[in-house]
């Protein structure tokens, strides 16, 4: 797809280009001046227009984490990439580019409007995560297979579709097929779908659609089952006890244990293993249930903490708003009085009074903020102690339960070694009646060989138990450390933001007063 500006030098999407675009699209007049002085943070930008820039590659957008609308049409972009951090994006225009495949949209789960018209796309796919998609523009591409339409049935919110200008739109059954297979579509190729035509199309393809619905229903059931399974697994991971609600750990001990699996053929070992597994799984289930109960306690502790923090902040903000409201009421009266005052001495007195009021407000707001900082610091410290104690108790009790797993393994090892030695003695004496597989009998050449085999199996089992314990302890300790660290950092950022807000407000009041003073002196 050639366009007049394709011959121009491709541009790099760098910080300079982004800053210029943000500046041009930012607030104007007084708000714009303030924004230019302080700089606009990319994370605060909600809409970004980068059309007709001759951009070849999407890059450097990772800081626009709160972006809602992105316009990249009329460039020379060849691939959809670099958008993974724009998770809040709702509207995306990539029309009039050189894109050949739909890709790179997996994280844009909030996208509602997507335009990819006038590109080189030949297949509709890789849109599955866009569950909120309402408008899809794919006109003037190279889509030629009607089966692409069926793919779009998975988007329940899709109401507007454009495919005109594609080879598929030239097919005789084009509209009828779409009307039948996309029954919730309202607009096709910029025209409202005729309800009568939709009913005719539905009747024509009724049998095929019924079969398709049956297959989709089965797929939906499997999908929901898998989603429920994954949700449960995520909950178990949050409690650090995933895969402990069954024989998973026990089975993993034998999955890599070649010698242990051979030894299971020995007479009496089968019954021994069965009893061992039953007891081992019971302990794992105890760890699992205890882990879930402790996770609930940690959640309650965290929720209570967050409520306390928000209540304290809200109460402090309400006090600040009240102080500001009283100040503004008095300040406005003083400003009006100054404007109407003709006596210079009286004017200077009122200006001094205004300056003192501004200083007093600043001090009051800063005192309120310092009080809040102290209050939140105390609350955070109490929470840190509580959550650390909860985690410590959890680890202590889990380690006690895992020690029981080790005791079971040690007991099993002793019994297995006893059976193995007795079997060796029977084989050496020719008293072994049971047939053993050749690879198992090969272990019984002498005592050292069989003792080493039993010992190797035991070591593998202990290592699996140790690794699971380390995984749990490391996981919950890391979670606790990161949580506490984030809470402290969030409070520092909140304090800095609040102090900045106070200074900006006071500076604005002072600037307004200074401008008034200069104007009156000149007059």
UniProtKB/Swiss-Prot annotation:
Record flagged with keyword NADP: no
> What InterPro entries has UniProt attached to this entry?
Cilia_flagella_integrity (IPR050576), Leu-rich_rpt (IPR001611), Leu-rich_rpt_typical-subtyp (IPR003591), LRR_dom_sf (IPR032675)
What residues does the LRRCT domain cover? Answer: 166-204
List residues traversing the bilayer: none
Describe where the LRR repeats fall, as residue ranges on this chain.
44-65, 66-87, 88-109, 110-131, 132-153
- Entry's localization field: Cytoplasm, Cytoskeleton, Cilium axoneme; Cell projection, Cilium; Cytoplasm, Cytoskeleton, Flagellum axoneme; Cell projection, Cilium, Flagellum
Lineage, top-rank taxon, reads Eukaryota
Asked whether the UniProt record includes Coiled coil among its keywords, one would answer yes
**Predominant place of localization:** cytoplasm
Q: Which UniProt keywords apply?
A: Cell projection, Cilium, Coiled coil, Cytoplasm, Cytoskeleton, Flagellum, Leucine-rich repeat, Repeat
What is its biological role?
Answer: Component of the nexin-dynein regulatory complex (N-DRC) a key regulator of ciliary/flagellar motility which maintains the alignment and integrity of the distal axoneme and regulates microtubule sliding in motile axonemes.
Q: Which family does it belong to?
A: Belongs to the DRC3 family.
PANTHER family the record matches: DYNEIN REGULATORY COMPLEX SUBUNIT 3, PROTEIN PHOSPHATASE 1 REGULATORY SUBUNIT SDS22-RELATED
Q: Under which name does UniProt file this protein?
A: Dynein regulatory complex subunit 3
Task: Please tell me the species this chain comes from.
Answer: Rattus norvegicus (Rat)
